[in-house]
Curated annotation (Swiss-Prot):
Protein name (record): Elongation factor G, mitochondrial
Summary of the function given for this chain in its UniProt record: Mitochondrial GTPase that catalyzes the GTP-dependent ribosomal translocation step during translation elongation. During this step, the ribosome changes from the pre-translocational (PRE) to the post-translocational (POST) state as the newly formed A-site-bound peptidyl-tRNA and P-site-bound deacylated tRNA move to the P and E sites, respectively. Catalyzes the coordinated movement of the two tRNA molecules, the mRNA and conformational changes in the ribosome.
Keywords: Elongation factor, GTP-binding, Mitochondrion, Nucleotide-binding, Protein biosynthesis, Transit peptide
InterPro entries: EFG_II (IPR041095), EFG_III (IPR009022), EFG_III/V (IPR035647), EFG_IV (IPR047872), EFG_V (IPR035649), EFG_V-like (IPR000640), EFTu-like_2 (IPR004161), G_TR_CS (IPR031157)
Cellular location(s): Mitochondrion
Domain tr-type G positions: 60-347
Family to which the UniProt record says this protein belongs: Belongs to the TRAFAC class translation factor GTPase superfamily. Classic translation factor GTPase family. EF-G/EF-2 subfamily.
Record SMART domains: EFG_C (SM00838), EFG_IV (SM00889)
PANTHER family (UniProt xref): ELONGATION FACTOR G, MITOCHONDRIAL (PTHR43636:SF2)
Length: 763
């Protein structure tokens, strides 16, 4: 059995449809079970195909997918069509529509006002995939629509962490853009196969072949078209299916009627044959069966092509490319068919966890209803009924009312309420089995926590969380505002890239995030959701300090003032280290190494030394910014049988580290951003001149017919107010994205200014 949903409110037709889909097999078997008065073996719930007795039939028809792309490529518009064509919503509303309703997946008021996706949103829908024999097969598609702006990249990270496949959307005019490359990197990090949809084929300057070339060259993944457009720009009518060599048109007022004809327009036959041959040639380099047919100069059948595309897509060696225009209601239904045909079901994906009881040994999880529960909390939201925790169930079944264990905290909790999500709407369910995406209410946990039924102690690896690069001091206009701290605590809990701390010296509240827009959104949410207006300081750059050479240390801390004294001696050295990955794939930029032998420093004091080292890294001695890329090696020392203590060794190591740090030729590092600018060709000189003033290094320039795209490396310290500059210099037609790239030594004059300012504050 795959899923048995007991929907608490059976008013709506779609709930009844979903219930029928998941319980058809169950009801038959349950009736038999009652007649026989005995338990039914679980194997009766499984399909009798090639993978009989291994996966439920319904599980093979489940897809968990994400919609990802560069900003303004049409992700949310595409998702709106998917929901409409699958019957999930009754009408289409545009992202910036005149009716002011907004797209279903943009549920936040801010999202609808700004016309951008800020938070990922989850939903599910049913799609009837027509089979070769004319029958229809029902598929369940769980969808997460993600933001395209780099400032909200954590939403993409946590979505891809739990999804099985993805639809990568490209703009037919702009092709592969900066955030496309970022999303590709995230997909590779979590081994997510993808199919590609070239959107906006109705726009002037649309060039799908250029976009496919960029997929091959910039993303370094084999890509080939499985469709070609019928018409272009304003005359776009439909697509030619290169696998079956047939034409597909969207008819009806909103493209809801799909018309398939066996003929191809005469003027497109040559192009169709050319692109089909290229598709076969590309697959021949990946798939053995197609390769043999290619060598024998035999033509593969549509079934062989589809099998090869699925195999190559699942192995992440290939991405099939589809075309259309979501806004013009063209090409969306064929892509839904492709989601069913080429993207994996949960059992096609290998997921692993770490067995805590076996020294964190890697174990493979099984997408099986009967196995012990393993589920991951991947996102938190504060809702009207308490904390809403988004869950991906990898193994077993999550049931309302059952007791489950948070492996990370050790707490045993009861599942009070379980829901399926449709953007900001929810539908109660009794249970969610392996492969499901659902949400729990009223469970206190952190993002990344693993839950089991208590019989096993597995933890799943956490998602990658980038470090914030911009900070801002804030304070409420009304000092008595009770919601200020409450709001910041909530935002931190929901968003791992949003950080809050109190500056120890100025006592100011400092918020940190991924960019100016990221922080602006939270300030607006403070004002709207908590009615707390804030006064902000000047944006701060996340400078860092590091050392450039090795320096030894030897320090004796000795204090006697009556009673028990303090005694501790530490010796060793500090040195520069390159960042390295830990076991979870996260970069570590500091290291404490204990080389003390013979008990010169008793073992109970070593943790105090390590703690002091980490505390020193939090605030550097040049400018007060954190220290990175530093290794401390503790080699020797001395202790007193009476006067030594943890405090004494913490004090000794703190003084020793400061002396060694100042002797190791420390410098200040500044964050360098990868900036991509797209603007009209006529404004190229103005844009380059503006970036030159900001000390940019131009890395690449791609000039199109009407627009050019420029990639540059720019110090973050020089990028403030750039958004208003580019708007004014390009008459509002230019846009840019910015992503953290690396740290480099700051220019000498910048270092001197920062050091002088810090010394002035600490006189």
């Amino acid at each position: 059995m795959f899923m048995r949903l007991k929907v608490l409110e059976m008013n709506s037709i779609r709930r009844q449809t979903l219930l029928r889909q998941f319980t058809n097999v169950y009801n038959v078997v349950s009736r038999s079970a009652r007649l026989c008065s005995q338990a039914i073996p679980k194997r009766l719930f499984y399909s009798t195909g090639s993978r009989a007795n291994s996966i439920p039939d319904a599980l093979s028809r489940l897809r968990n997918i994400g919609i990802s792309a560069h900003i303004d490529s049409g992700k949310t518009t595409f998702t709106e069509r998917v929901l409409f064509y699958t019957g999930r919503i009754k009408d289409i509303h545009e992202v910036r529509g005149k009716d002011n309703v907004g797209a279903k997946m943009d549920s936040m008021e801010l999202e609808r006002e700004k016309g951008i996706t800020i938070q990922s949103a989850a939903t599910y829908c049913n799609w009837k995939r027509k089979q070769k024999d004319g029958d229809e097969q029902d598929y369940i598609i769980n969808i997460i629509d993600t933001p395209g702006h780099i400032d909200f990249t954590i939403e993409v990270e946590r979505a891809l962490r739990v999804l099985d496949g993805a639809v990568l959307i490209l703009c037919a005019v702009s092709g592969v853009q900066s955030q496309t490359i970022t999303v590709d990197r995230q997909m590779r990090r979590y081994n997510v196969p993808r199919i590609t949809f070239i959107n906006k084929m109705d726009r002037m300057g649309a060039n799908p072949w250029r976009a496919i070339e960029q997929l091959n060259a910039k993303l370094r993944i084999a890509a080939a078209a499985v469709q070609i457009p019928i018409g272009s720009e304003d005359n776009l009518e439909g697509v030619v299916d290169l696998i079956h060599m047939q034409s597909i048109y969207n008819r009806g007022k909103k493209g809801e009627k799909v018309e398939i004809t066996g003929s191809i327009p005469e003027h497109l036959k040559e192009l169709a044959n050319e692109k089909r041959a290229l598709l076969i040639e590309t697959l021949a380099n990946i798939d053995e069966e197609i390769g043999e047919l290619y060598v024998m100069e035999e033509t593969p059948s549509p079934e062989q092509l589809m099998s090869a595309i699925r195999s190559a897509t699942l192995s992440r060696q290939f991405t099939p490319v589809f075309m259309g225009s979501a806004l013009a209601n063209i090409g969306v239904q064929p892509l839904l068919d492709a989601v069913c045909d080429y993207l994996p079901n949960p059992s096609d994906v290998t997921n692993t966890a770490l067995d805590v009881n076996q020294g964190e040994k890697s174990v493979t999880l099984h997408t099986d209803y009967n196995e012990p529960l393993v589920a991951l909390a991947f996102k938190l939201e504060d809702g009207r009924f308490g904390q809403l925790t988004y869950m991906r169930v990898y193994q077993g079944v999550l049931k309302r009312g059952n007791q489950i264990t948070n492996v990370n905290s050790g707490k045993r909790i009861k599942v009070p309420r379980l829901v399926l999500l449709h953007s900001d709407e929810m539908e109660d369910v009794e249970e969610a089995p392996a492969g499901s995406i659902c949400a729990m209410f009223g469970v206190d946990c952190a993002s990344g926590d693993t839950f089991t039924d208590g019989s096993i102690k597995y933890v799943m690896s956490s998602m990658y969380v980038p470090e914030p690069v911009v900070s801002l001091s804030i304070k409420p206009k009304n000092k008595d505002s009770p919601n200020f701290s409450k709001a910041l605590a909530r935002f931190q809990r929901e968003d791992p890239t949003f950080r809050v701390h109190i500056d120890k010296e100025s006592n100011e509240t400092i918020i940190s995030g991924m960019g100016e827009l990221h922080l602006e959104i939270y300030l607006e949410r403070l004002a709207r959701e908590y009615r707390t207006e804030c006064i902000t300081g000047k944006p701060r750059v996340a400078f860092r300090e590091t050392i450039t050479t090795k320096a030894p240390f030897s320090y004796l801390h000795k204090k006697q003032s009556g009673g028990a004294g303090q005694y501790a001696k530490v010796e060793g050295y500090i040195e520069y280290m390159e960042p390295k990955e830990d076991g979870n794939g996260r970069l570590v930029d500091h290291e404490f190494v204990n080389h003390v032998v013979g008990g010169a420093i008793p073992s109970q004091y070593i943790p105090a030394c390590e703690k002091a080292f980490k505390e020193c890294l939090e605030r550097g001695f040049l400018t007060g910014h954190p220290i990175k890329n530093c290794r401390l090696v503790l080699e020797d020392g001395a202790a007193h049988s009476v006067d030594s203590s943890e405090l004494a060794f913490r004090v000794a190591l703190t003084h020793a580290f400061r002396q060694a740090f100042m002797a190791a030729k420390p410098i200040v590092l500044e964050p360098i951003m990868n900036v991509t600018v797209t603007a009209p060709v006529d404004d190229q000189g103005v844009v380059i001149g503006n970036l030159d003033k900001r000390k940019a290094t131009i890395v690449n320039t791609d000039i199109g017919e009407e627009e050019f795209t420029l990639q540059a490396e720019v110090p973050l310290n020089s990028m403030f107010s750039y958004s208003s500059d580019i708007r004014s210099s390009t008459q509002g037609k230019g846009e840019f994205t910015m992503e953290f790239l690396k740290y480099l030594p700051a220019p000498g004059y910048v270092q001197k200014e920062l050091i002088a300012e810090y010394e002035k504050q600490h006189k």
